[in-house]
């Protein structure tokens, strides 16, 4: 407390309240683990959307008694519920596949501070007690680390809401024997990171991975005098700027990553789209089993015949079995000009009867068909309170 400065005194009080909130959030997460254990014993689904909706409606009523806005309460507790769902999913999956795994070696793109590094840490924090970090220079190196047994898991970006699909990763999925065992989505907030006092006009050279430059192209175009230099990762760009120690250079990357290199944020929120997220996939040498208590996603890769309507016919099989396709991506087949492979994300468990029936039908009408993996879906669509 600082009685001589009323503003500082109030901030001290706010900090004290924030600490209490953190303690309560941690306590709530522990209760979510107990709920997951109870559901494991009774084989009940992880999600109960009606219960979530009723919870939100009750909290809105309670919030009004404290003059708290309904929209504020809804947004806040949708995040809390999402954390609870993902925590419970992770516990069920660990119990089913790796009940005794406490540490994992995870390969990712770049040194510490890259977005892939942050995604790997997020995944490990939910699924393991600790993580051994295996930073790599290229996507190909990440795959090889796991294939050769140097790492247990690969965390790789697959698509971004602003710049679209990451084709290099899709192409590697054609060639690897690894299976997709998980996914996660990371909010991306690109910043201009500098080593000391400077301004945007004084900067001459900006370093980053090609993806941030694509995602922030509208902001970048405002400074035509900037020289753009590509690096293997955002973390490599931060490392470079930290080493150069010049007011004329900057990096595009995350604030959390910049802190690891003692860089300062000069500008935030650079992306063309306000909602900028990257979806990452997690790969391992062995496929996993997904509990039928958990929402699942299955990723397929297939090549259809060259006749007209072949792809449409294949997709109709999914529709006939009430399977929802959430992603369709095409990539050229190496060595076969004008021929394409199709990557399909389907909402559903590989072991379900309808998925098995659909795969049997697809097998007879495609030139090749491969399941890349079945894994828990981490896209938690928030429940909405009744109007």
Curated annotation (Swiss-Prot):
This is Bifunctional chorismate mutase/prephenate dehydratase. SMART domains: CM_2. Substrate binds at residues 11, 28, 39, 48, 52, 84, 88. It comes from Enterobacter agglomerans. Pathway: Amino-acid biosynthesis; L-phenylalanine biosynthesis; phenylpyruvate from prephenate: step 1/1; Metabolic intermediate biosynthesis; prephenate biosynthesis; prephenate from chorismate: step 1/1. Residues 105-285 form the Prephenate dehydratase domain. Residues 299-376 form the ACT domain. The keyword Membrane does not apply. One of its GO terms (molecular function) is prephenate dehydratase activity. It is found in: Cytoplasm. The gene is pheA. Transmembrane segments: none annotated. Residues 1-92 form the Chorismate mutase domain. Its EC number is 5.4.99.5, 4.2.1.51. GO terms for biological process: chorismate metabolic process; L-phenylalanine biosynthetic process.
